[in-house]
A protein has these predicted regions:
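A contiguous pocket-lining binding segment that forms or flanks enzyme active sites
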Residues: 127-165
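Hydrophobic, well-structured mid-protein blocks that either form specific transmembrane helices
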Residues: 87-137
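Helix-turn-helix repeat elements of alpha-solenoid scaffolds
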Residues: 37-50, 83-94, 129-136, 175-180
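Canonical positions in the second alpha-helix
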Residues: 54, 98, 141-142, 181
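Bacterial Sec-dependent N-terminal signal peptides
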Residues: 1-24
Length: 213
């Protein structure tokens, strides 16, 4: 009888844990869909807040911290009037938590690179030495952790696109990176429904911008 009770108790615990995981996954999937369809900084602000609430409830999962940071960074890139340092600092805190939970994950290091770029945009001339180094180091770490991550080549191409040729950038260099990214997207399959999958459409748009020059 004791063994039966112990077995039933164990099964009950497993069932509860499974139900919680299912709820987490469903909530994440719904919020990721909202992120995919977000059009404005206001939309992204709402989505970022939702991911933060999920992260507060699921402190051992890296994905909600990742998506909260990604949403926050996208606000900074799309809203010209907003304080980019404030958003960058907020994203940095979220990224740090994601890194602590997934220290070998290419995607979270890509966000570190994106955040460095956002900080640098405030004053490119005076901040390039610090944040330019941070940007490149985080990007290279992301590439080393997963050489097949198409988003790392998209991001490298984006940096080249907006950097003059005399400083090592230019649209010819960017074009090569975007083409490489799209090659990898053809083979890319997200690990699961919560894995990052963004970037292909914007890469196509950036490649067309290179061809239009």
């Amino acid at each position: 009888m004791k063994r039966i009770l112990l077995s039933l108790s164990f099964l009950a615990v497993v069932a509860v844990a499974s139900a919680q995981d299912d709820k987490f996954q469903k909530t994440m999937e719904q919020t990721i869909t909202m992120l995919d369809s977000a059009k404005t900084p206001e939309d992204l602000t709402d989505v970022a807040a939702k991911f933060e609430r999920i992260a507060d409830a699921e402190t051992t999962k890296w994905q909600p911290y990742y998506y909260a940071a990604l949403s926050t960074l996208w606000i900074g890139y799309r809203d010209e009037k907003i304080d980019k340092d404030v958003l960058g600092d907020k994203a940095d805190g979220l990224i740090s938590k994601a890194v602590s939970l997934a220290p070998k994950n290419s995607e979270v290091y890509l966000l570190k690179s994106m955040s460095a770029s956002l900080h640098m945009m405030v004053d490119p001339m005076n901040r390039f030495q610090k944040y330019g180094t941070d940007l490149r180091e985080a990007l290279m770490t992301a590439r080393q952790l997963d050489p097949t991550n198409p988003r790392t080549f998209y991001w490298e191409g984006t940096q080249a696109f907006y950097t003059p040729e005399q400083f090592g950038g230019g649209k010819a260099k960017a074009k090569l990176m975007f083409e490489k990214s799209l090659e990898l997207y053809k083979k890319f399959k997200p690990e699961n429904s919560m894995s990052p999958h963004w970037g292909e459409e914007i890469t196509k748009q950036m490649l067309e911008a290179c061809k239009g020059e």
